[in-house]
Amino acid sequence: EITLIGEDSSVAGLEVGQKLTAKQLLYAMLLPSGNDAAYTIAVASARKFKENDKLPAKEAIEVFAELMNDAATELGAEHSHFTNPDGFHDKNHYTTALDMVKIASYAKSIPLISEICGTYQITQKLKSGEEFYWVNSNKLLNQGEDCYSEYADGMKTGFTDEAGSCVISSFTKNGKTMLTVAMNSPELYGKYYDTLILAKLGFKQNKIDCSY
């Protein structure tokens, strides 16, 4: 399934034959934006859903896309449609900022996902023996960056030529969590500075002091 990823995809460096736990696959997908991990998770999930370990990878991706769309509908993401697990451009693959917030809000409520998305870096030894070091692509979590925020604790970056540079972020202070979405930024860092402005406005409206 990792051979199905698009050209120039961001990857976690996985290879055929390696063995990972489900949690390691999530780290590989969510920290370095590993599309190889995303496809592996998608195929495994679809095969389990269909109770068919021999389901061809391409068919499994179609099944997983259906599952994604069903889940999105249940979450109220009515203006989204997904065709693949990694967000690669497709005319039938689309979403909105509001729908992304709805999906991210649910993801944030899952402790494991929240923990992983808020992790800046991690070293993992696979079940097959290989060792990997993954760094989160979200620069809001990097203390060495000007856009770093001590309140940032997620969630996910994204990029395609068509969608531009995007990020959905979470900030937590005084027990309150704020989700923001920045899309189609023409510059890599532009989305982060826009995000910081949005977070400040959000916390201000909720009367929570938040200075960076």
Q: Which residues are covered by each model-predicted region?
A:
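Active-site SXXK
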Residues: 1-3, 100
